[in-house]
Swiss-Prot record:
Keywords: Ribonucleoprotein, Ribosomal protein, RNA-binding, rRNA-binding. PROSITE patterns: KH_TYPE_2, RIBOSOMAL_S3. InterPro entries: KH_dom, KH_dom-like_a/b, KH_dom_type_2, KH_sf_prok-type, Ribosomal_S3_C_sf, Ribosomal_uS3_bac-typ, Ribosomal_uS3_C, Ribosomal_uS3_CS. Pfam families: KH_2, Ribosomal_S3_C. Coiled coil: none annotated. GO terms for cellular component: cytosolic small ribosomal subunit. It comes from Karelsulcia muelleri (strain GWSS) (Sulcia muelleri). The keyword Acetylation does not apply. The keyword Iron does not apply. This is Small ribosomal subunit protein uS3. Residues 36-104 form the KH type-2 domain. GO terms for molecular function: mRNA binding; rRNA binding; structural constituent of ribosome.
Length: 226
């Protein structure tokens, strides 16, 4: 089963927490969250955003953004944050709080690794070179394993094919294994190329507070909170 389902959803509630923390009015809230994430990802495309967490209370919405380039999001003296709040009022009619966390080791973040490979492919770079660089970088910062699967018309070949690159161990059926996973697409002149990335960071033993998003073994540094 661990090889078929989404790696993160398979661990949801065990060692992986929820990216949206709220209840009630599910259809409205899920649609609103989707619009917020889509807008922020497009608006902050140069900031290397990994994940966006949304928490709602009665009178406030807390948006937590993890990024490897937080200075782009914050701006000089927090000026960009103020702009973001005004722009987000299109979707949200409550008080907005924005927290920014810096990812100290982007090589261990599956979202950023997959986006990096996709960016190089869209700029007509070699997919083999891009993958080898990402694997080497992850292992240098003590990843226990990394697996990258790429599929599509690689190098403009007439027939689509799949290739898999793996170093170290990726125990998908071990629930205590802290494996980050992400899937993205590269839009090239030859069509869409799919990219999947798994990164094994270690194993988590005992209970874990799933609602305290950033107090993890692999910590992120909080750089801004209004």
């Amino acid at each position: 089963m661990g090889h078929k389902v989404n790696t993160l959803s398979n661990r949801l509630g065990l060692i992986v927490g929820w990216q949206s923390l709220w209840y009630s009015h599910y259809p409205e809230r899920i649609k609103e969250d989707f619009k917020i994430r889509k807008y922020l990802e497009n608006r902050l495309s140069k900031a290397n955003i990994s994940r966006i967490y949304i928490e709602r209370s009665l009178n406030r919405v807390i948006i937590t953004i993890s990024s490897s380039r937080p200075s782009i999001i914050i701006g000089k003296g927090g000026s960009e944050i103020d702009k973001l709040k005004k722009e987000l009022n299109i979707f949200i009619y409550k008080k907005i709080q924005i927290n920014i966390f810096e990812i100290k080791k982007p090589e261990l973040d599956a979202v950023l690794v997959s986006k990096s490979i996709a960016s190089q492919l869209e700029n007509r770079g070699s997919y083999k070179k891009a993958i080898k660089i990402c694997i080497s970088a992850a292992l240098q910062v003590n990843a226990e394993g990394i697996k990258i699967k790429i599929s599509g018309r690689l190098n403009g070949a007439e027939m689509a094919r799949k290739e898999t690159y793996k170093e170290g161990r990726i125990p998908l059926s071990t629930f205590r294994a802290d494996i980050d996973y992400h899937m993205t697409e590269a839009h090239t002149n030859y069509g869409i190329i799919g990219i999947k990335v798994w990164i094994m960071k270690g194993e988590i033993y005992g209970k874990k507070n799933l609602f305290n998003i950033f107090k993890l073994k692999y910590k992120k540094k909080k750089v801004y909170s209004d």
